[in-house]
Regions:
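C-terminal motif of bacterial Sec signal peptides marking the signal peptidase cleavage site
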Residues: 21-24
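Glycine-centered hinge/linker elements that transmit conformational signals in sensory
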Residues: 192-234
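Extracytoplasmic/periplasmic solute-binding protein
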Residues: 134-135, 152-202
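Early extracytoplasmic/lumenal segment of secretory-pathway proteins
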Residues: 31-96, 100, 110-113, 117, ...
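Extracytoplasmic/periplasmic substrate-recognition and gating elements
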Residues: 264-330
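Conserved C-terminal helix/tail region of periplasmic/extracytoplasmic solute-binding proteins
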Residues: 353-429
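Bacterial signal peptide processing site
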Residues: 26-28
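Hinge/lid segment of periplasmic solute-binding proteins
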Residues: 92-142
Length: 429
């Protein structure tokens, strides 16, 4: 948060003082360029190691600030008028809001060429189409995890909905995935971009299908899922994963590709979620995806070069080389990326689904929605999980529809600004 900026400022000040003592050294050396991002632990270490190598020959120093409270940190820095040069966010809704408020700088070439749907759709601003962010890494959703040898004809679902301030998002992933496979990319895209009512039959059906798939839970089981992290319980070596967590009598887990890090070395199986969701056959090759996108918040022209280097084939190669296999990043396109050492079976399966099997990729719907609506969606999922009665669902969807309409009215400046609508696309954009 602001403390991070203070510490960085002190480091820069001390470095400047030392330089001033050396004859011939300039006392006005440029500040480091700061990247604010969501990765901590081993992910953060790998990204920071790659970043430190990418500034070679630039005359600038790149530094990384990683936090799990990314939104709160960025909001605090913007309020203090001390934004990072570059921030990496996973929410198109938040990025869209920052662009609307004039906080982002349009991307320069050649970075703009690496930004394509569904990860980085263009925005209409002041009558011009502009690109404000580029995907650095992506995650494939629409996946189901289980132990090898476990029958899949009658799965018992592991559910952990807790995630600190964003609790509920694992449930929104379920509903989004079900709607995508039942209704198809068209209705999904309209719903994600606030052009479809929350009372629409396709939306209602997705919620009720989720309740049916998870039916038969005891009050104790419901409370356990509401209070347990999506990473599962914690052991001496860290999160165990829901499939390995004591007290969870379950066989299958619906979760994004990133969860592979908690199952590293386990006898694990991953497969597409389509056949579990009571969807249509024609939608089986549609997949939900997420991403971490870089945007420029600074007028410093070197910040544009920083993002260009991060999103380049060389930047990807360096990042991938620094990462442990369990947290090795996935990229939105492999063109220009030199081959690396063979991946394990799970990575090979995920890579094949993302780059070969998938015909349509749709960005995570809640991450496209405006933050107010997304947060309300999270809360509604938690309430519905506790009480899935039809009458309760109708009340929750009415509340979400009211928020959708209100947010649209509050941001009714379509003549000068239009949020993205193309959040489903083929693998190549």
């Amino acid at each position: 948060m602001r403390g991070l900026r203070v510490v960085r400022g002190l480091r820069v000040l001390m470095a400047g003082c030392l330089l001033a003592l050396v004859p011939g050294c300039a006392s006005d050396a440029p500040d480091p360029l700061v990247v604010l991002g969501p990765w901590t632990g081993k992910e953060g270490e790998a990204f920071e190691a790659a970043l430190q190598r990418l500034d070679d020959g630039t005359g600038r120093t790149y530094t990384y600030e990683g936090t799990r409270s990314l939104r709160e940190t960025l909001v605090s820095q913007l309020e203090a008028d001390t934004p990072p040069d570059v921030a990496v966010l996973n929410s198109i809704g938040e990025l869209t809001e920052y662009a609307r408020r004039g906080k982002l700088r349009p991307l320069a070439e050649p970075t703009r060429e690496r930004a394509f749907s569904p990860w980085a759709p263009e925005l209409l601003v002041d009558g011009s189409q502009r690109t404000y962010w580029v995907p650095l890494k992506v995650d494939l959703k629409s996946l189901v995890w289980s132990k090898k040898g476990t029958p899949s004809d009658r799965p018992t679902w592991c559910v952990g909905l807790a995630s600190q301030a964003t609790s509920g998002w694992p449930g929104t992933d379920w509903i989004e995935d079900i709607l995508l496979h039942q209704a198809g990319p068209g209705p999904y895209e309209k719903w994600a971009t606030s052009r479809l009512s929350w009372r629409d039959p396709d939306v209602v059906r997705a919620w009720t299908t989720w309740a049916q798939l998870l039916a038969g839970r005891t009050d104790e089981s419901v409370e356990q899922s509401l209070t347990t992290s999506y990473e599962g319980t914690t052991g001496p070596a860290g999160p165990r994963g829901l499939l390995n967590s004591p007290g969870f009598d379950c066989t299958h887990e619906h979760q994004s590709a990133f969860i592979r890090y908690v199952y590293a070395g386990d006898d694990i199986r991953v497969e597409p979620s389509a056949r579990f969701l009571r969807g249509r056959a024609e939608n089986r090759d549609a997949f939900e995806v997420a991403g971490d996108m870089a945007a420029v918040f600074s007028d410093d022209p070197d910040a544009q070069e920083l993002v260009e280097r991060l999103s380049s084939p060389a930047g990807r190669k360096r990042w991938r080389a620094e990462a442990d296999p369990a947290v090795r990043p996935l990229f939105p396109a492999v063109t220009g990326l030199p081959p690396t050492e063979p991946a394990n079976a799970v990575e090979q399966e995920i890579d094949g689904l993302l780059n070969s099997t998938a015909r349509t990729l749709c960005f995570d719907a809640s991450d496209v929605m405006p933050p107010e609506l997304r947060d309300a969606f999270h809360r509604a999922v938690l309430e519905f999980f506790r009480d899935p009665a039809k009458k309760h669902l109708a009340s929750l969807l009415e509340q979400l529809e009211t928020i959708r309409v209100q947010v649209d009215e509050d941001a009714d400046d379509a003549r000068s600004f239009r949020p993205p609508e193309d959040i489903c696309a083929g693998p190549g954009g």
